[in-house]
């Protein structure tokens, strides 16, 4: 599996002829460059232009299968589970809702629904936290086996702080931790919290299941 990072919460995972995009960036985003590659599956965690650009993951006549929201899915033999969590990313403080976003996206606790996705791809289990801003996960998710890889947001208004991001990553006991939604300051703080100031920094990451053997909470930084 090959992993690349494309700003914000956008991650591309490719193996063989299959490409999955997590959090594709829309052309309407004011913060990040829109996604510019084709994908077979697009996972949408949050109904916000920074993360709902499934149309940008289309190429020619090929359109991705879009997974958007909690539930159980199976696409091309890949089982995907989505779990409802909370995010306040991109909310208008005066209304507690993002501009132009439907009230159905609002949680009962305030904020918006952020879907955390769990799946196994190319023999590697992945947990993608999206734009989550809470450290308490749904019971069903907490009871699952430890993931091989967790993608965790560490900066941006409305997501976890670097400190909370590290606490959640530690609790999840993932073999590999990859930060998303980071800037230089928040990344530095997150790496300090994790005791990984000398973490490996790469433009793309190629992994096989055997590469994860013996790893415990190792942080790798993917450059956009």
Language model regions located:
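Proline-aspartate-enriched helix->loop->beta-strand connector
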Residues: 39, 149, 156, 165-182
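Short acidic-hydrophobic surface loop/beta-edge motif
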Residues: 11-13, 69-76, 119, 207-212
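Short Gly/Ser/Thr- and charged-rich N-terminal loops/segments
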Residues: 98-101, 105-109
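Mobile, glycine- and charge-enriched loop segments
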Residues: 111-158, 223
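Binuclear metal-ion centers of metallo-dependent hydrolases, dominated by the metallo-beta-lactamase
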Residues: 4-6, 176-224
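Enzymes that bind and transform nitrogen-containing heteroaromatic metabolites
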Residues: 139, 143, 154, 161-165, ...
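Active-site-proximal beta-strand elements of phosphoester/diester hydrolases
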Residues: 2-5, 20-23, 77-85, 118, ...
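Pre-active-site segment of Zn-dependent metallo-hydrolases
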Residues: 10-72, 81-92, 110-112, 132-143
